[in-house]
Curated annotation (Swiss-Prot):
One of its GO terms (biological process) is rRNA catabolic process. GO terms for cellular component: cytoplasmic exosome (RNase complex). It holds the Pfam family RNase_PH. It comes from the Archaea. Component of the archaeal exosome complex. Forms a hexameric ring-like arrangement composed of 3 Rrp41-Rrp42 heterodimers. The hexameric ring associates with a trimer of Rrp4 and/or Csl4 subunits. Keywords: Cytoplasm, Exosome. It is found in: Cytoplasm. This is Exosome complex component Rrp42.
Length: 267
């Protein structure tokens, strides 16, 4: 059978289910897929987590390296988030340098961590203006079945929350790192993102891949532990009317607390 015809049939099935008040996988419109988190899965990383969100699966590793502070923040450490989307995870992903999807994914996670002030960057300064810890958060997608944003945020904050920082001291202008002598990374918050797909006038929490293919637009809302919205990212070309935007943000704020409880219970 023609692949385009198969795609049209599947699109019709997904849309028909939504219009009937259902979803293709049987969930309610406001329901997340099952969330599984396993922390500490990479022995050589300073922190790590494996996340399953339905059939979406990814692993996040945190690695700390000694670097130089930025000139405009000489008393702070640095944060760098990277995402790797490989063909093994989804045929639509291409090998090579990060594409626009990987870059957007990295930026959404980075912004959520920064704007929530999850990490106390000042605690990562070793010597003001000279040496600091650079925190690398690397996201590796293993299986893509939709909503990489929320899965990546869950994995990143989970990995950071168990990260251990080696003690370091400066001797004769050189940084000596004591790998076996560590302390927990200073954490101030536990941000959670909630992604909502808009299909017509319908709002779907945690869209699976089949729903992402037909959605008009997407909103990813990152929420702090206190319930404050700290970051919002809109995706795709469709519009988001004001009344639906308000509904989406309210819904995201409510769901973020549920997801946070689920994740923390597994750490």
């Amino acid at each position: 059978m023609d692949l385009d015809l198969l795609a049209r049939i599947k699109r019709h099935e997904v849309l028909a289910a939504i219009r009937a008040g259902e979803r293709i996988d049987g969930r309610d419109f406001e329901e997340f897929r099952p969330i599984e988190v396993r922390a500490g899965v990479i022995s050589k990383a300073n922190g790590s987590a494996l996340v399953r969100l339905g059939n979406t699966q990814l692993v996040v590793g945190v690695k700390l390296e000694v670097g130089r502070p930025y000139p405009d923040s000489p008393n702070e450490g640095a944060l760098a988030v990277n995402a790797e989307l490989v063909p093994l995870a989804d045929p639509s992903f291409e090998p090579g340098p990060p594409d626009e999807n990987a870059i957007e994914l990295s930026r959404v996670v980075d912004r959520g961590i920064r704007e929530s002030e999850m990490i106390d960057l000042e605690e990562l300064c070793i010597e003001e203006g000279e040496h600091c810890w650079v925190t690398f958060v690397d996201i590796h997608v293993l299986d893509h079945d939709g909503n990489l944003f929320d899965a990546s945020m869950i994995g990143s904050v989970s990995a950071l929350s168990i990260t251990e920082v080696p003690k370091a001291e400066v001797v004769d202008d050189e940084v000596e790192v004591m790998e076996e002598d560590t302390e927990p990374l200073a954490i101030n918050d536990f941000p959670i993102s909630v992604t909502i797909a808009k299909v017509g006038e319908y709002l779907l929490v945690d869209p699976c891949l089949e729903e992402e293919v037909i959605m008009d637009t997407r909103l990813t809302v990152t929420v702090t532990e206190s319930g404050e919205v700290c970051a919002v990212q809109k995706g795709e070309l469709g519009d988001f009317p004001e009344h639906l935007l308000e509904d989406a943000i309210d819904l995201a704020t409510k769901k973020a607390e549920e997801v946070r409880r689920t994740v923390k219970a597994q750490l």
